[in-house]
Amino acid sequence: VIGAFILLIVFYLMHKNNIKPIAISRFKALKKHIILIIGSIIMIYVFESFYQILMQFLPEKFQFNDTENNKDIAKMFTHGWLVPFLFLDIVILTPFVEELIFRHLIIHELGKKLTYGLMYIVSILIFASLHCVGAKSPFEIGPYIIIASMIVFVYHKTGRNLAVTITMHTINNAVSFLIMVMGL
């Protein structure tokens, strides 16, 4: 959480002269992308459900019910006093930080030097890989590739509007957070 705050402060200080008007215009453009955001989140769940069905055909040693990353996060919910901090981290900070890193830095900034298409792929693979550090099955990367691919698709379709992907990521994480809190 502290690292996330530091990253956000550094990003703000680097862009303090022009961040406010850009952020305002990008968030104002959100309205016209609501259907895309909601549709893409629904597609994430559809693709993940289909992926889970396909996992049943793998040898048992490669199958999994939940990713190790999700199991680790679920363990944190056993301490009730942590829930407000987890909300701040999972629903608020993480979408901002991950979108700044994976969409703004990797795609937007490196895409200027290399190609945007290549950086789309790099962003997806790094995002997914970092969410699977403790994975027991190599196929645990699948759900994260699905999530990252849909976010990158939305980022591309909206003309690389970071406000849209932050919102999409926030909604996706909020749904996951509610599922964890309700113990579903």
Label each residue range with its predicted role.
Residues 1-18, 68-71:
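Alpha-helical transmembrane segments in multi-pass membrane proteins
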Residues 3-7, 40, 143-151:
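Hydrophobic alpha-helical membrane segments
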Residues 4-7, 45, 173-176:
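Helical transmembrane-bundle signal
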Residues 5, 9, 42, 77-78, ...:
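Polar low-complexity intrinsically disordered regions
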Residues 10-32, 106, 163-164:
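Cytoplasmic juxtamembrane interface segments
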Residues 15-20, 56-64, 132-136, 160, ...:
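Transmembrane helix-loop junctions in multipass membrane proteins, especially transporters and channels
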Residues 20-94:
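Juxtamembrane helix-loop-helix connectors linking adjacent transmembrane helices
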Residues 49, 80-184:
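Transmembrane helix-loop-helix hairpins at the membrane interface
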